[in-house]
From Swiss-Prot:
Residues 471-640 form the tr-type G domain. Residues 505-509 are annotated as: G2. One of the essential components for the initiation of protein synthesis. Protects formylmethionyl-tRNA from spontaneous hydrolysis and promotes its binding to the 30S ribosomal subunits. Also involved in the hydrolysis of GTP during the formation of the 70S ribosomal complex. It comes from Burkholderia cenocepacia (strain ATCC BAA-245 / DSM 16553 / LMG 16656 / NCTC 13227 / J2315 / CF5610). The lineage of its organism: Bacteria, Pseudomonadati, Pseudomonadota, Betaproteobacteria, Burkholderiales. The gene is infB. This is Translation initiation factor IF-2. One of its GO terms (molecular function) is guanosine tetraphosphate binding.
Amino acid sequence: MASNNVAQFAAELKMPAGVLLEQLQAAGVQKASEDDALSEADKARLLDHLRKSHGATDGDKRKITLTRKHTSEIKQSDATGKARTIQVEVRKKRTFVKRDDVSEGAEQGQAQVAEADDDAELKRREEEARREAELLEKQAQELRERQERLEREEAERRAREEAAEAERRRAEEEAAAKRAAAEAAAAQQAAAQQAAAEQETAPTQSAQDEARAAAERAAQREAAKKAEDAAREAADKARAEQEEISKRRAAAEAEARAIREMMNTPRKAVVKAAEPPKPAEPAKPAEAKGTLHKPAKPEGAQARPAVKKPAGAAAPATTQAPAGAGDRNKKPGAGKGGWQDDASKRRGIKTRGDSSGGVDRGWRGGPKGRGRHQDSASSFQAPTEPIVREVHVPETVSVADLAHKMSIKASEVIKVMMKMGQMVTINQVLDQETAMIIVEELGHRAVAAKLDDPEALLVEGETGTDAEQLPRPPVVTVMGHVDHGKTSLLDHIRRAKVAAGEAGGITQHIGAYHVDTPRGVITFLDTPGHEAFTAMRARGAKATDIVVLVVAADDGVMPQTKEAIAHAKAGGVPIVVAINKIDKPEANPDRVKQELVAEGVVPEEYGGDSPFVPVSAKTGAGIDDLLENVLLQAEVLELKAPVEAPAKGIVIEAKLDKGKGPVATILVQSGTLNRGDIVLAGTAYGRVRAMLDENGKPTKEAGPSIPVEIQGLSEVPGAGEEVIVLPDERKAREIALFRQGKFRDVKLAKQQAAKLESMLEQMGEGEVQNLPLIIKADVQGSQEALVQSLLKLSTDEVRVQIVHSAVGGISENDVNLATASKAVIIGFNTRADAQARKLAEANGIDIRYYNIIYDAVDEVKAAMSGMLAPEKREVITGMVEVRQVFKVPKVGTVAGCMVTDGIVKRSSSVRVLRNNVVIFTGELESLKRFKDDVKEVKQGFECGMSVKNFNDIIEGDQFEVFEVTEVARTL
């Protein structure tokens, strides 16, 4: 901001405006007020005045000193012969004096001062140059000695090689001559023998002799040809060796020539850099002026490139020298501390990028400089695109395997995981989702894959079955809210009394029945209506063809009714609405219809597609109409399934029977299940040893849409698992074991992925109470529903921890686990055996038995409420007014008080109020009436009180007396 007046200039200088006005007036600038304008001339006059007042003779600088520092390196051998790099620092200092028109005496004095400074500087520079020249001379002498030694060793080695080569050639020539002479003698001898033989046997064997003579002549020609080939091969070998020796000699000469060039160039460069500047130049006015205006270009600035240029020119000579035999046969210590190391050992300024021009790209591969490499090739590297791989990610994969699939190091994967907040090792197992995120983070394409999956054979087997499709009975699931009469409706249809036998009058198991009607067979699935059995209802909707939605006419649409509608719509299943309990006086079917329309279920009479049938499970009214509508919907759906084919189905319910072992209720969806078939259900497999219908009677086969109970599985299957018949038990075992391993790996991987988050949550939550439980139920569905219901009770302060949950009776193993984990055992429709009961009594383990899910949930909720920290509340018991204050030695301040309201107890806490503002909160130290200690003082009485650790009491203060009470909390 340009300052236009005195006030702005004072603000810019951060000084009072009055002081600035005084300084301006002292400088001869007449300014009367802060609003007066200031010009640049006024500011210049003020500056001159201030300089003179501070002792400066003139406003201009008379002298300027420039300091420059230059660092170079030289090689110096120590006593051990090892070359060391020595830093040589040259400091230069120049003083420039401004000359003007002053008296001659002043000029001479200034010239003498400048000359004295220049003489001292010149002497110091000459001394430094002399020392540097000595060091360089010593270095050059060492280089010459080393070069002479290298040349001498090279000449000796070359002479030895030439002598050995000549000796070897002479030996080879003698051997070749001997071989040729021997072969010629052998040929002559063979010819003589042949001639003698011919003369002896000519009269009798003329034909045989001619053939033998031809063979011998061919052998002689072959021998002569071999001798010629051997001689030619020996000559070629000798010529190649001679060429190799010539190449080595040329390489050695080139290296020696490069060394000689190097010896000559640095000397000149360093000596030139060390030349002191001429002392007469700074005295010239024109040059002094130029130096003052352009301080970045002193005279020595041109000397620096002269130092660097020869060194840079020597570097290409290094890289262009051919790497021949001279480099390979050179002794390891021969080049130690030589000129090749200058560029790589020289320290440079730290910059971004490569500023060395390729000199520092050498690498050292062994001790004492062996394996040294210079980048003799071009420094250009062609740009390459990153390779994007398609990585098939299985459901579980270790960090090492994932890195191998992407062709990178495992440490790169670990880095990415650490950035994501997870600490892993190379053997850590990752789930598929996490692994795919990592693959995409590293720039590759992730593909979910199931490699080496034996279940693929099941899909291939399914496509190969082309059995005839025949009509099958419909599977109808009865759904609705609890106590709306679903089971009673089924009892009337089946002529049974199942509802009377249910504990508490509510259904807690999913049941499967088939009913023969005059128009065909219908299979019913009865689902529980309690909110805890959501998973059961979802399984029922998954396996069904038609949903019968039971709604009580006196109760209307309830939460589980809405949930059943959502399950049916999600499965795309048609809905038949049965409005039950129409025999009650308070029944209102029209209200039920309106509520169902609001939920998206529109009756046929309103233009929808859902038939509404009013029924009464008690009187049987409307039952036939309901069955008629169900069968009508089934005809519209045209339900068909193959009969003469291996069976497929779904597990409706599963349990562990003490005498029968694992028992599963399955619904056959297609094919025919026979006794003795090999079945696979999730991770369980086995041969069907026994098969019972819903009435408990043995049966040999079950067709489509028929529910049966099977025995013979290896373990209790999960409810909702798909059941399939396989021809081979070995294949069933293989698939079951594969599923077990996959389930275990996926579970461990997900636990590991959530471990860090749970740790951080626990750290943030602090102390959390845990209620460990062990749950044993009669069937899988009930166990699943009970676990989910109890886990929903967890809060931020008390958490339900399910240590173990399974199907079957309570055993000794369960009691031992409860002892180790300090858990409570809950038995739902199960009991503990005698050994388990004795062990539980001995260890003090609490075992609770329930047959209604409400009771189990309510009691666990009450136990969790007891574990909650009690809530603390303050109750004000009285008010006290201070009338007089006494100072008692060794005791402190005692207040004489009047109890104006309530009662004051000795054990109470107190707040000190002054003008209705709390100034202290603490405890009563003493409570006296007259001179006696009392426990309490009632309203209207005087007393003496002292507060612990508080003595600042004055008359008129008020004491608010209160007590802290603990109140039990509930969930």
